[in-house]
Amino acid sequence: MNSNASNTPIAIGISQIFPCSYLDGQQEQLLVIQEETLDPILFDRLLAIGFRRSGSAIYKPRCPRCSACQPIRLPINEFMPSKRQKRTLAHNRDLTWRMTSEHTEAQYALYEKYIRERHFDGPMFPPSKSQYEQFLFCHWLPPTFIEVYDGNRLLAVAVTDTLPNSLSAIYSYFDPDEERRSLGSLLILLQCRLAKLQDKEFLYLGYQIDANRKMSYKRLYRPYQILTPQGWEYSQVC
């Protein structure tokens, strides 16, 4: 693959086949960019062809017998919150939010609580600081943290990459004791708002996996586009 920015070839490797962490009985294989450092412009273009970031690794599913992972993005200028999403915004008007590049102990403490209480049956349990940092941080692209507060108490965090043409939602977590606030939905809505404020064209939400209930919520934000073999296509779901 060549970079349009520099016309320099980019090395791409392929992983071994291993059990899928999202769908029972399926096998997973990844295309992996084998470069120590990437230009943000190039990474934006890689997002547009279905790649994703985990730590400093840039990957894309290339599974032998499955195509369940569908890259999904929101065209920001067309996004319209649903009635339920508007209620979520109204219900949380008492909260404040801010952007920061600072990584804090409070952020990690909230992440640890979230994983222990919400994902104790998943591959990220038990949580550890080293796992957290390897998963979220990238030496060539420091993430932005969108923090949500109730007074001085941190309630939720969205880890977000800022690219020239887009934002990319890396991971979100929140206080499980505040489930009534729909903080996961609020974080996506705040990322949409931030993308609009920064004049970005898209918010990338990662991969939509219809067969995994925990990964199917992304279709609730409309209109959205799914990357197909023919390119990005708008959803036909009403």
Swiss-Prot record:
Transport recorded as keyword: no
One of the GO biological process terms: ubiquitin-dependent protein catabolic process via the N-end rule pathway
GO CC annotation: cytoplasm
Localization annotation: Cytoplasm
Molecular function GO labels: arginyl-tRNA--protein transferase activity; leucyl-tRNA--protein transferase activity
One Pfam family this sequence matches: ATE_N
E.C. no: 2.3.2.29
Keywords: Acyltransferase, Cytoplasm, Transferase
Substrates-to-products reaction catalysed: N-terminal L-glutamyl-[protein] + L-leucyl-tRNA(Leu) = N-terminal L-leucyl-L-glutamyl-[protein] + tRNA(Leu) + H(+); N-terminal L-aspartyl-[protein] + L-leucyl-tRNA(Leu) = N-terminal L-leucyl-L-aspartyl-[protein] + tRNA(Leu) + H(+)
Keyword Cytoplasm: yes
Function: Functions in the N-end rule pathway of protein degradation where it conjugates Leu from its aminoacyl-tRNA to the N-termini of proteins containing an N-terminal aspartate or glutamate.
Family under the similarity heading: Belongs to the R-transferase family. Bpt subfamily.
Protein name: Aspartate/glutamate leucyltransferase
